[in-house]
UniProtKB/Swiss-Prot annotation:
Belongs to the NAD-dependent DNA ligase family. LigA subfamily. GO terms for molecular function: DNA binding; DNA ligase (NAD+) activity; metal ion binding. It holds the Pfam family DNA_ligase_aden. SMART domains: BRCT, HhH1, LIGANc. One of its GO terms (biological process) is DNA replication. PROSITE patterns: BRCT, DNA_LIGASE_N1, DNA_LIGASE_N2. Its cofactor is Mg(2+); Mn(2+). Its EC number is 6.5.1.2. This is DNA ligase. NCBIfam families: dnlj, PRK07956.1. NAD(+) binds at residues 34-38, 83-84, 112, 135, 169, 285, 309. The keyword Metal-binding applies. It catalyses: NAD(+) + (deoxyribonucleotide)n-3'-hydroxyl + 5'-phospho-(deoxyribonucleotide)m = (deoxyribonucleotide)n+m + AMP + beta-nicotinamide D-nucleotide. It comes from Caldanaerobacter subterraneus subsp. tengcongensis (strain DSM 15242 / JCM 11007 / NBRC 100824 / MB4).
Length: 666
């Protein structure tokens, strides 16, 4: 590799790593395994060391992680939450040992499991839990104190009135993860990919009540700082924390030689699949705290510790067939049917192939011999093809352009990796579609929740959203827990929903990429469902805030005959198909830009946004110098602080309502 090739490869690696950093640290939606990520980072570090002229301060090799999101207040860590350097072989562990001993002489090590969860910092003042934060970028994280307080293994008060800071890993036990996904599947909600994603998503919920319902746990693995006490070793400090009421990291083993360390790593690796929680490695730490002080740290990691990463177990097997499954969002996912093989203690007979690009990139064919592992220790995944074992009888796979469940068009929009079914009648996604249609921001059918929808579907009383308007009292009274009053109330709510405005109907149809704001723009312009269905791709592109993907999505949706039939049946049932007149509503917010933060008492965010847009205003998601008003509800996020810094006018819900009534002029 010459200098120019190295420069291009370094740029490519940085782009990939920054992308995956964003997916992992900011969105909590990783697309690759930790092992694959580590290999990318290792290659970048090696190239930058070989070509130091290309190393820059903003390279991902020089940083700890991703930026925190805006939903929570930022919190600057008392002690920076640095990462650990990684090792993948016994020789690399021995090299770490040599570096340590060159600096401080003989040492004692501890080996402990590396819990696969979400790292947090807990601050205690006078023995009381005061602040809990996520890692964020290592310097500034997110203040998630109310959510962490719902985890029962986190003590709210310590035994002693001490000031201290600890670091721990929040995780979800394997059994709890399986139960949670089972419950989400029953409700028609998207599933978590692995326990780590479930833990991270639960901690970062805006509503602590949601977090409280999730079975989260924590292991404390380090005492970051304490006032008025000294400890000689890490193990001694952990014993103190245990006495104070903390649940400390288990399976710790003290080692006096590097050979003992390697043996402890191997023993931990042998038992990891049988543990009730996920681990993705072992952490090796210097036990003596005074020697840690001497060893210190770099800008991104500690010199006194290293993480050994276990490679994902891979097995060889054969692809018998490739089938396509339709998810609840209409996404078509190719799945490999395999000759059964045991991986990490369980029999695997199917593996995800993600999407058609993944199949094409890896040149996966029916009949191929492949290597399979469990991504995140949970999801079976085809990693690569063993091409030298091909016989010539393998068959190429072609993604269908029709939904295998309902026969509707399966469309892949530009820039998207997945193909989606466009059918309103698709049985694979109908429950989710009806739940969305009945939701508060769409047709707002009070009393029509997931449980009732599930019963209606299982009894064959409905097959699509239009069928709701043909239900009779005799249909509803047969449902479980449905009495006379409940049945009549639901029929009344369904009848009432017929008068909803056009934008709410359009949003309720669940057209891919068309949210409530886009639906408002479209309804305001075209005025009727007939006009919308007749409109061409170019017509939608002329509208503000409607891009090419959204335009293509809505045109494709209405080109599908079964969707047009559903709309026709809605019309026959008496559902409003016109943009309702807003009466005497004036353009009092003309040219004004609003941002909303926190929970409003009398409106959802979409309802408040609709009122603003109807009156000529615009609603954006972030505060800037162009923002005219920030409407603040309960438990506002960091937008409030930014608005104060920029001098943006801040109003509460009562002032907003006064503006709507004309009592206050904007």
């Amino acid at each position: 590799m010459d200098r120019e090739e190295a420069r291009k490869r370094i740029e490519e690696l940085r782009e990939k790593i920054n992308y995956h950093n964003y997916r992992y640290y900011v969105l909590d939606q990783p697309e690759i395994s930790d092992y694959e990520y580590d290999m990318l980072m290792r290659e970048l570090i090696e190239l930058e060391e070989k070509y130091p002229e290309f190393k820059t301060p903003d390279s991902p090799s020089q940083r700890v992680g991703g930026e925190p999101l805006d939903e929570f207040e930022p919190f600057t860590h008392i002690v920076p939450m640095l990462s650990l350097a990684n090792a993948f072989t016994a020789e690399e562990i021995k090299e770490f040992d040599r570096r340590v001993k060159e600096a401080v002489g003989e040492v004692e090590y501890v080996v402990e499991p590396k819990i696969d969860g979400l790292s947090v910092e807990l601050v205690y003042e006078n023995g009381m839990f005061t602040v809990g934060s996520t890692r964020g970028d290592g310097i500034v994280g997110e203040n998630v104190t109310p959510n962490l307080k719902t985890i029962k293994s986190i003590p709210l008060r310590l035994k002693d009135s001490v000031n201290l800071v600890v670091r721990g890993e929040v995780f979800m036990p394997k059994a709890s993860f399986a139960k949670l996904n089972e419950e989400r599947a029953e409700r028609g909600e998207s599933l978590f990919a692995n326990p780590r994603n479930a833990a991270a998503g639960s901690v970062r919920q805006l509503d602590p009540k949601v977090t409280a319902k999730r079975d989260l746990d924590i292991f404390i693995f380090n005492l970051q700082r304490i006032e008025g006490r000294d400890f000689k070793t890490h193990v001694e400090a952990l014993e103190f924390l245990k006495e104070q009421g903390f649940k400390v990291i288990p399976l710790i083993k003290k080692c006096t030689t590097i050979e003992e360390v390697i043996k402890a790593i191997e023993e931990l690796g042998e038992m990891k699949d049988s543990l009730p929680y996920d681990i993705d490695g072992a952490v090796i730490k210097v036990n003596e705290l005074d020697k840690r002080e001497i060893l210190g740290q770099t800008a991104k990691d500690y010199r006194w510790a290293i993480a050994f990463k276990y490679p994902a177990e891979m097995k060889k097997t054969k692809i018998v067939d490739i089938v396509v499954q339709v998810g609840r969002t209409g996404a078509l996912t190719p799945t490999a049917v395999l000759e059964p093989v045991v991986i990490s203690g369980s029999v695997v007979s199917r593996a995800t192939l993600h999407n058609e690009d993944y199949i094409k990139e890896k040149d996966i064919r029916i009949g191929d011999t492949v290597l399979v592992h469990k991504a995140g220790g949970i999801i079976p995944e085809v990693v690569e093809v063993v091409k030298e074992e091909r016989t010539g009888d393998e068959k190429a796979f072609v993604m269908p352009d029709k939904c295998p469940e309902c026969g509707a068009l399966a469309v892949r929009l530009p820039g998207e990796a997945v193909r989606r079914c466009t059918g309103l009648n698709c049985p694979a996604q109908i429950a989710r579609r009806i739940i969305h249609f009945a939701s508060k921001d769409a047709m707002d059918i009070e009393g029509l929740g997931p449980a009732i929808i599930s019963q209606l579907l299982s009894k064959g009383l409905i097959q699509n959203v239009a069928d709701l308007y043909y239900l009779k009292y005799r249909d509803l009274i047969t449902l479980e827990r449905m009495g006379d009053k409940s049945a009549r109330n639901l029929l009344e709510a369904i009848e009432k929903s017929k008068k909803r405005d056009l934008d709410r109907l359009l949003f309720g149809l669940g057209i891919n990429l068309i949210g409530s704001k886009a639906a408002q723009v479209i309804a305001e312009h075209f005025k009727s469902m007939d006009n919308i269905m007749k409109a061409k791709y170019e017509d939608f592109l002329e509208l503000p805030d409607i891009g090419p993907k959204m335009a293509r999505s809505i045109v494709t949706f209405f080109s599908e005959e079964q969707n047009r039939r559903v709309v026709e049946r809605l019309k026959e049932a008496g559902v409003n198909m016109e943009k309702l007149s807003t009466g005497k509503v004036s353009n009092i917010f003309e040219g004004k830009i609003f941002v909303l933060t926190g929970a409003l008492k009398n409106y959802t965010r979409d309802e408040a946004a609709r009122l603003i847009v109807e009156r000529g205003g615009k609603v954006t998601n972030s505060v800037s110098k162009k923002t005219d008003y920030l409407i603040v509800g309960a438990d506002p996020g960091s937008k409030l602080k930014k608005a104060q810094e920029l001098g943006v006018k801040i109003i509460n819900e009562e002032q907003f309502e006064a503006m709507l009534k004309g009592d206050i002029q904007p």
